[in-house]
Every structure is written in C-alpha cells, then in structure tokens.
Amino acid sequence: MRIIRRISAVLIGFVFFLAGILKIMDPVGARLVVEEYLKFLHMGWLNGLAGVLASGMALLEALLGAALITGVWRKVAGLAVGVMTAFFTLLTFFLYLKNPHMDCGCFGEMIHLTHLQTLLKNIILLALWALAFLPLNKLEPTRKVKYVSFPIAAVSVVGFLLYSSLTIPLVDFTPFKPGAELMLPEDIDDPNDERTPTLSLSDASGEYFDDLLMEGDLMVVSIYDVAKLKPRQWDKIVKLLQDAAATGYKPMVLAAASPSIMQESTSAPEVLDATYYADRKKLLTLNRSNGGASYIQEGLIVTKWGIRGLPDQEKLQELASADVTESLLSENNGDRLKFQAFLLYVFAVMLLL
C-alpha cells in the first residue's frame, strides 16, 4: 500500500509539473486563457492582472508538482494540491454544464481537452489524491536528500519562468507553429475552427489581401499592441524591414490597430508603406512577441523571432540562400532540444538526486 500511495502522489506530481511548465513556457498564451476564464466568470475587471495571475498559477502548479515528485513537505503539499484539484473540479463541472466556447488551458497549447475530458481528468486526479494522501496522519517521512533536490528544481523552474518572459516559446504548439502552412479563409470548411492556421489581412481602405501571404519570401512583423512599443523597438523594426527589403524579402507589418493609430505611433515610411491590418487574437497566435517577426515562404511558416532577438542582415541572407526545409529544421530543432534538455535535467534532479 505504501508503494501505491507513493506512485499515486508522483503521478499527480507529473501532471501538475507538466501543466505548470507548459504554461510557464508560453506566458502570453497562459494569460489569454486566464482572460477567457475571467470573462466567463464575469470578472473582466481583473484583466489587468491576468498576466500575473497566469504566471503565478503556472509557477504554483510546477512547484507543487515538484514537491509531490520529490516528496518534500508531504502534508502541506498534499493539502494544497487537494484544495486546488477540488476547486478546478467544481469549476470544470460548471464549465461542462454551461459549455462555453473556450479551452481549459490545462496543458497550454500542447493538449486541448473538451470540458468533459477536463472534468474526467480532474475526477481521476481527485481519486489519486485520496489514494495518496488519506489519511494525512499516515504519510511516509521524506528522505533528507530530497530537501536538496527540491530547491534545485524550484530555482530551475523560476529561472525558466524569467527566461520565458523575455522570449517566444522554445516549442510552439499553436496552429501557427513553424512548419504549418497557412490556409485562405475561403478554403476551410469551418470558419470557426481556431486550430486551422488562417490569417486574413486588409489595407487601410478595408480591402482584403489574404493572397499576399501565399506569395514569395515574406518577413512579417506582427504588432498586436501598438501602444506598448517603445521608440527603440520601432527603430529595431524599421532596421529589420530595411534589411529584409535589401535581401530580397517582401517586408510586411501586420497590426491590430486602426490606420490612424499606426500613423500616430510612427512616421517611418518603411513601416506605414508595408502595413496591413489583422485580428489581434490571430496576431497573438502567429507570434507571441509584440513586434516579433515571422519568416513565411509561400504560405509556409519557417521560423520566428521575438522583438528582443530580431535577425540581422547576415542572418536574413543566410536564410534566403538556404533550402527552406533545411532552414525549418535548423532554426527550430535547437530550441526544441533545449526544452527537452531542461525537462530531462529537472526530472533527473527530482527523481535521481
């Protein structure tokens, strides 16, 4: 029975840790999910804190998961996990009854569950929790070495949170991930299917130019919050657009704003002459970084950069001269390996140390 209780606790820990880490890797996506929950609960007045709430919840999930895996502070961690699981079970039961058009966001963009699937998942977690922690006064003592492995894992998770807040996700699970091929809105059966990578754009007069995304080598800068861009960031965008044009790319800016706001925000002709307008949520999905860039080759999303790491002209020339398949692999496999290495390292610390 002791082994069964320990295995149950570790299984819950894995679920919590993975759920937290996936949301930590994509803080913008986690914030969007929290905003959806706040809207559903009629608590939109808290939207200004959505980012903090999302990151805080993700960090708490990951740390509680690490605590269960390592076995430290079992009673406190067990109570906290039990309360959280019970709360989310009640919330998902309410979601199941109301069936709003929203995703649970349990595992970020990696895994999408229906409300019923989420409810069943939480019920299973509750059953495992009861098996692992009841009665609370009969929990096994923790090996002393685990009080060393947990802080190492915790510091690593916090460091990953800080890193993720400054970059785009190491692994992109959105419909607009590298390797995805854009589709025209008229070519899909269900226009409400958010998992299909469609992007519609128009000029200042409202005329649509969706076909432009299917033509040639595009360097697309996406701006979903014009007001938050600083002068030095505008300078970086202008430099990228100049370098892209000089290297043979078609520079394009997609903004979730009105033409008048764009003209008030910048006077650079490199930006204004290349600007089209698109849906804010689509731009957030295309690139999590406000002012980030995406290389699109004849409708194929090749790679992306955040505003802090925009490519220089030498990098653009390298990509332009390379085979698109090679670029797709070389530009994205490195980040995927970094994420896998991070997970292996943290799990090794928690399980083997």
Give each language-model segment a name.
Residues 2-25, 50-91:
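Functionalized membrane-embedded alpha-helices
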Residues 159-220, 227-239:
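Membrane-interface segments at or immediately adjacent to transmembrane helices
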Residues 252, 269-288:
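Short, internal strand/loop/helix patches
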Residues 42-60, 116-120:
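Interfacial helix-start motif at the membrane-water boundary
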Residues 142-169:
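Internal/C-terminal transmembrane anchor helices
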Residues 291-306:
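A short, hydrophobic beta-strand/beta-hairpin element that forms part of a small beta-sheet core
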Residues 86-138:
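Membrane-embedded alpha-helical segments of integral membrane proteins
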Residues 177-183, 306-353:
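Thiol-/selenol-based redox modules, centered on thioredoxin-like
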